[in-house]
Amino acid sequence: MRALRLVTSESVTEGHPDKLADRISDAILDALIAQDKKARVAAETLVTTGLVFVAGEITTEGYVDIPNLVRKTVREVGYTRAKYGFDADTCAVLTAIDEQSPDIAGGVNLSYEWRVLKSTDPLDRVGAGDQGLMFGYATDETPELMPLPITLAHRLTMRLAEVRKTGLLPYLRPDGKAQVTVVYEGDKPLYVKTVVVSAQHSPEVEQEQLREDLIREVVRQAIPPEYLKDGETEYLINPSGRFILGGPHADTGLTGRKIIVDTYGGAVPHGGGAFSGKDPTKVDRSASYYARYMAKNIVAAGLARRALVELAYAIGKARPVSLRVETFGTGVLPDEKLTEIAKKVFDPRPLAIIEELDLLRPIYTPTSAYGHFGRPGFPWEETDRVEALRREAGL
């Protein structure tokens, strides 16, 4: 028997203050990119008691009524009553928006390859919006080709929001969190060791009723029964006790503070760049999406059971300064060979990514909660490079 290990991941609901900030930032991005595909957007949001503050750098021919859009977004999430301590109709909305730095714009609009190397390749024209490293990952332990702990954590928070919105558990409020610890034997997930659910609620509900309801209607609906082991799985439901004050009234929220929730739950490294509120010339976002696309196709093609793709960029330069594939000993070919195959099949230049994944569309608000990866409907989740990868691998 191989040694057992524990892997833990967390998720938060759309009503968590950091996620509310992410959603507002992405709503602004979507509203602008729907009008102006060339919009350059870096929208940052802070939410606290009675206040939303939106700042950032935006260059666009479009126009968005930011205060009205903020209120609409807050209302959609569910902060609609003053007793929640944060209300869409009464919160103040402040803005401080500048244009994108002309120095940055110059390097993005006309890349190092065009300016210095005199390239005439159209896909070389747009440079990366910043330096940095980005990671994409896929694993065959779930149908979504995502790590099991983060997949289950997202299912819990999505279910928590669902039972609130449908009125099945009418005493729930928008804020909430979940955490899942999974027992692994080697790379194989065996069962869930610990489930943590913290749900904001009205003062009237008793803790015992809350516990029973959340185990029955949330945990057992979200986690497949084969992963819940009698006598082994521990259920920690609101382990701190009462959770009446929540959302921005209890904790200040900021865009970009849930980067591990947004990605792979800590299963692999993270380059540090956040996603929400950024247009796709920002490789923090678009290259992370493309790295996931690459990794998922490698696993879907049967070239590895686990694949990590690392990309790195220099600001103003179109071509990555590095590209690496790592398969943790699960690849059918050496990692060096898979890296060479990936370079032939994929094109991670910013403009190529934008065109291939069709990223100049208002598709970003749904990504702002419950993870950017492992959900259908996003172009970076497609597996349309499988045949090309298998051909290059000689399979």
Swiss-Prot record:
Comment on bound cofactor? Binds 2 divalent ions per subunit. Binds 1 potassium ion per subunit.
Q: Quickly give the catalysed reaction.
A: L-methionine + ATP + H2O = S-adenosyl-L-methionine + phosphate + diphosphate
A GO BP entry = one-carbon metabolic process
The top EC class is transferase
Q: Name one GO cellular component term.
A: cytoplasm
What metabolic or biological pathway is this protein involved in?
Amino-acid biosynthesis; S-adenosyl-L-methionine biosynthesis; S-adenosyl-L-methionine from L-methionine: step 1/1
- Give a yes or no for keyword Transferase in this entry: yes
Q: Which SUPFAM superfamilies match?
A: S-adenosylmethionine synthetase
Where does the UniProt annotation locate this protein? Cytoplasm
Q: Where does K(+) bind?
A: 44
Query: Where along this sequence does the record place binding of Mg(2+)?
Result: 18
The catalytic activity of this protein is classed by the Enzyme Commission as: 2.5.1.6
Required co-factors: Mg(2+); K(+)
Chain positions recorded as L-methionine binding sites = 57, 100, 251, 282
GO MF, one example: magnesium ion binding
Quote the InterPro entries the UniProt record gives.
ADOMET_SYNTHASE_CS, S-AdoMet_synt_C, S-AdoMet_synt_central, S-AdoMet_synt_N, S-AdoMet_synthetase, S-AdoMet_synthetase_sfam
Summarizing the function annotation, the protein's role is: Catalyzes the formation of S-adenosylmethionine (AdoMet) from methionine and ATP. The overall synthetic reaction is composed of two sequential steps, AdoMet formation and the subsequent tripolyphosphate hydrolysis which occurs prior to release of AdoMet from the enzyme.
Its family remark reads: Belongs to the AdoMet synthase family.
Q: Which HAMAP family match?
A: S_AdoMet_synth1 (MF_00086)
Q: What is this protein called?
A: S-adenosylmethionine synthase
* Source species: Thermus thermophilus (strain ATCC BAA-163 / DSM 7039 / HB27)
